[in-house]
């Protein structure tokens, strides 16, 4: 059984026991989080729409990490303007504990 869940504006395919890196979710490591299911597949049975109200996808926060550094640069022609910058996204590692 697996589910497609939505968090942080993105969708992730998860199964029970999976570790998933998602956009940062507030909470302490060890605390539980409920994720919003978009689709649930159990063998040949596919659950979508209004039937998802009875489906719960629970996960546990494992840790908060930061993603890889992304370097960028702004450049304006003929003016001598150059600007370099870097960015590291804050992520949360979740362990899916149950799809019911």
Swiss-Prot record:
Alphabetical keyword list: Ribonucleoprotein, Ribosomal protein, RNA-binding, rRNA-binding
The family line of this record is:
Belongs to the bacterial ribosomal protein bL21 family.
Which NCBIfam families does the entry mention? L21 (TIGR00061)
Stored PANTHER family: 50S RIBOSOMAL PROTEIN L21, LARGE RIBOSOMAL SUBUNIT PROTEIN BL21M
> SUPFAM superfamilies, from UniProt?
L21p-like
UniProt keyword Chaperone, yes or no: no
Q: Name one GO molecular function term.
A: structural constituent of ribosome
Q: Which organism is it from?
A: Corynebacterium jeikeium (strain K411)
Q: Could you give the subunit structure recorded for this chain? A: Part of the 50S ribosomal subunit. Contacts protein L20.
According to its UniProt entry, the protein's GO biological process terms are: translation
What function does this protein fulfil?
This protein binds to 23S rRNA in the presence of protein L20.
GO CC annotations?
Answer: cytoplasm; ribonucleoprotein complex; ribosome
Can you say what this protein is called?
Large ribosomal subunit protein bL21
**Pfam family, any one:** Ribosomal_L21p
